[in-house]
Amino acid sequence: MSHISFDFRSAYLRKSNTVHMILPDLPSVGPRFSDPKEFYGSGKKYPVLWVLHGGSDDSSDWIRLTNIELYARERQIIVVMPDAGNSFYANWKQAMMQFNMYDFLTEELMPLVHNWFPASSDPSENFIVGQSMGGVGVAKYVANHPELFGGGAILSMGIPDLDDADRGFLTANVITQLSRANGGLEEAKAGPDNIRAAMIRNKDKLPPMYCSIGTADPHYEELYLPFKKFTEENGIKMEFKEYEGYGHEWRLWDLEIQRIMDLFGLKTI
């Protein structure tokens, strides 16, 4: 596979942003060998997996800490990993000169990737996955823009009720960050960061959704289980899976990214 790390000045982030990408390259051995001119000039469009990193991480973590490049190579797909800082994939309108991470993905990065690279823009061939804070981003994008994705996977996270800040430290942290981004809790409730409300509103339009966690993860009882109960009580279709003994860790996420690719029909070629 080809690995690209590129920086470009974003209109929505008001700064340069680093994006890591994995792209199919010329098969060099076996029956998949092809002529370079034929391969690169074929005009073929490949499925895209959008991968959102967690808090205190960056766009390089999935490259450095998992075998995602190998798994993408086996399936001949494009993987896109943007850098979101600690934004919770929200629009921070009062930060610096504005840091509109939520809009950046759908309004800037997706058009860039779909038009500059051999990436399919067909929603049925675009999938999104993220761990921890990235899971909040996944839920937010799929709930508010179900028309853009063929599936979404939330790893090691649950989506809290914005009125539930007294549940515990982890829940309060998510709600606090989303409130800060919007300039207040009521403002957060009125926009795309009210993820549960968006899920209820668009529950008949949602693509296939998946959510998993390790039972030793501190998010398990405080965030994951209440979120699972919420989906069941509101008729929101989502597949849930728990892994005994795993914590908040890359060993689990490396296993899960393979399972998710298969779940979304991105099979080994």
Regions found by a protein language model. Name each.
Residues 1-269:
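Non-catalytic cap/lid and distal C-terminal segments of serine-dependent acyl enzymes
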